[in-house]
From Swiss-Prot:
Residues 11-56 are annotated as: 2 X 7 AA repeats of N-A-Q-G-Q-V-I. GO terms for molecular function: DNA binding; DNA-binding transcription factor activity, RNA polymerase II-specific; DNA-binding transcription repressor activity, RNA polymerase II-specific; RNA polymerase II cis-regulatory region sequence-specific DNA binding; sequence-specific DNA binding; sequence-specific double-stranded DNA binding. The keyword Transcription regulation applies. This is POU domain, class 6, transcription factor 1. In the embryo, widely expressed, with highest levels in the developing brain and spinal cord. In the adult, mostly found in the brain, where it is diffusely expressed with the exception of an enrichment in layer IV of the neocortex. Also found in kidney, lung, heart, adrenal, skin, and placenta. Low levels in spleen, muscle, liver, anterior pituitary, testis and ovary. GO terms for cellular component: nucleus. Pfam families: Homeodomain, Pou. Transcription factor that binds preferentially to a variant of the octamer motif (5'-ATGATAAT-3'). Residues 66-88 are annotated as: Disordered. Residues 234-293 bind DNA. Keywords: DNA-binding, Homeobox, Nucleus, Repeat, Transcription, Transcription regulation.
Length: 301
């Protein structure tokens, strides 16, 4: 109401923390009496303090004024509850269950299902012949069994002439081109070649081999002229030492592991062996000793 001031509440530091309300007598307000006859009653508040002594609220505890007759409402209102409702603890929400699902196993191709072969995976004659229940003719009408037999006989006939794959490859390269090199001859004999390539090589190799056999019947020199190289040198037979010779050589080696040329000649004459054989024996013996000393370094005592 105008003209009425409320008492102010302050704390120990002089800070304003609230104001005390004034209660006006409702009975006097209801009458049309002049404003100066109004009765004002002071309300004595009760202060609410916290643990630190600070005022947190005020409660009015003075007697209430005389009630005024009021028409009872049609619907009773529920009295306000002054009790502080306890805070119900919220139920802990369980964490979402994690379900681990194993991936579906990959379907294994059935053993009976045929595997498609691309152009880069063309099977060789050896792979086709080695498979069980393989027809003798492939898709292009090439007789695989005939090629296999010819490759086997070609190798036997080549060795009987004393020719190597390199000699055959050099002779064919000079007359037919680089497609008939030593590597091509090697793959053909091992059947490590596609059926089409084998079918292309077969007539050329057969013609050349027949000609080489005719030249060989006329003489080894004619064959070498046809092949275009010197006769192949036979490998020298390996020399075997007797136990007495080995004992004598070891005795010489203990005295002098690196003999001079004159000393090697004298040892060879004494043991009745070729000088080159004795020289090679000393070289091999020194290399064996060197390798043995290297191994001893890594041995744990």
């Amino acid at each position: 109401m105008p003209g009425i001031s409320s008492p102010i509440l302050t704390n120990a530091q002089g800070q304003v923390i609230g104001a005390l309300p004034w209660v006006v007598n409702s009975a006097s307000v209801a009458t049309p009496a002049p404003a100066q006859s109004l009765q004002v009653q002071a309300v004595t508040p009760q202060l609410l303090l916290n643990a630190q002594g600070q005022v947190i609220a005020t409660l009015a505890s003075s007697p209430l004024p005389q009630p005024v007759a009021v028409r009872k409402p049609s619907t009773p209102e529920s009295p306000a509850k002054s009790e502080v409702q306890p805070i119900q603890p919220t139920q802990a929400v369980p964490p979402p269950a994690v379900i681990l699902t194993s991936p579906a196993p990959a379907l294994k191709p059935s053993a009976s299902a045929p595997i498609p072969i691309t152009c880069s995976e063309t099977p060789t004659v050896s792979q086709l012949v080695s498979k069980p229940h393989t027809p003798s003719l492939d898709e292009d009408g090439i007789n695989l069994e005939e090629i296999r037999e010819f490759a086997k006989n070609f190798k036997i006939r080549r060795l009987s002439l004393g020719l190597t794959q390199t000699q055959v490859g050099q002779a064919l390269t000079a007359t037919e081109g680089p497609a008939y090199s030593q590597s091509a001859i090697c793959r053909f004999e091992k059947l490590d070649i596609t059926p089409k390539s084998a079918q292309k090589l077969k007539p050329v190799l057969e013609k050349w081999l027949n000609e080489a056999e005719l030249r060989n019947q006329e003489g080894q020199q004619n064959l070498m002229e046809f092949v275009g190289g010197e006769p192949s040198k036979k490998r020298k037979r390996r020399t075997s030492f007797t136990p007495q010779a080995i004992e004598a050589l070891n005795a010489y080696f203990e005295k002098n592991p690196l003999p001079t040329g004159q000393e090697i000649t004298e040892i060879a004459k004494e043991l009745n062996y070729d000088r080159e054989v004795v020289r090679v024996w000393f070289c091999n013996r020194r290399q064996t000793l060197k390798n043995t000393s290297k191994l001893n370094v890594f041995q744990i005592p």
